[in-house]
Swiss-Prot record:
It comes from Lithobates palustris. The keyword Secreted applies. One of its GO terms (biological process) is defense response to Gram-negative bacterium. Belongs to the frog skin active peptide (FSAP) family. Brevinin subfamily. GO terms for cellular component: extracellular region. This is Palustrin-1a.
Amino acid sequence: ALFSILRGLKKLGKMGQAFVNCEIYKKC
């Protein structure tokens, strides 16, 4: 269970990074 939670957090982190890149650096 913990492993899947960590994997989900990593996926969320990538999505968050993409969102930051899009919003701040205009890299969409």
